[in-house]
Amino acid sequence: AFDQALQLRADAPGQYQGESPKPYWNMVGPFGGVTAATLLQAVLQHPDRLGDPLALTVNYGGGLVAGSFQIQAVPVRTNRSTQHWTLSILQAGPDGAPVVTTTGTAVTALRRETWSVGDAPAPQVPKPADLPAIPPAFEVEWLRRYEMRPVTGVIPQVWDGSGDHSLSQLWMRAAPPRALDFCSLAAMADIFFPRVWLRRARRTSRRH
């Protein structure tokens, strides 16, 4: 399902057409992680790409609706080792005119021999097999696309304002299992539930 969700048709260099993926539907539009992964996929498919993804920032202006969309991926600056991108997703609005739903930036870079160091050690947590997988919460499709085994930071069981932290720690993988790559990592980076849900543990009511 994930690879199908990322399928894009190139109309011209940097111009791609895609379809909103129903298997990754959220409460409003697709799961934001798969939207981010689709933007990155456009960069990876661009014939002028230099190097591999180094950074990705996505700004969600509005939810995608069901149907087709267009991605514009533009390499705005290419240096000797790095390349900088601007990204946007457009869909037809109520009047048929294109409307920007999502924007983003990305940086790709050539891999060179250098040094590396890890300043933040991995947290000491139980092994995945020692933690139960949580069933999908809410009636949204995208939660069925992942297996999650939380250590801490699950959705509050009681919404009484008793939240005291916003830390989420969990093991996760695609369901069914799929090898990790740049796009799947970009999608998984958005899996965590909203911080405010954990910190406040309080529902809000809408006024009509």
Model region roles, listed by residue range:
Residues 1-208:
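Terminal targeting signals and extreme-terminal segments of soluble enzymes
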